[in-house]
Amino acid sequence: MNNLEKIYRLCDKIEKEKKYLFCLWPIVDGRVGLDVLDYETEDRVDGSTFDNALDVIDWLEENYVR
């Protein structure tokens, strides 16, 4: 399993709590962007751009995995 697939699986796991939605967008130079949206309103509540997929995984686990 590659790192992007790991991110998608982690986002799916978090989304089951019905608090947040995630929008992942790869950037041409290898960086990755992630927007965190409110589950009900779909307003952007958090997110950032990251140097690589592993940074996204670490950030999600630190901030959103309960």
Swiss-Prot record:
This is Uncharacterized 7.9 kDa protein in cd-pseT intergenic region. It comes from Enterobacteria phage T4. The gene is y13G.
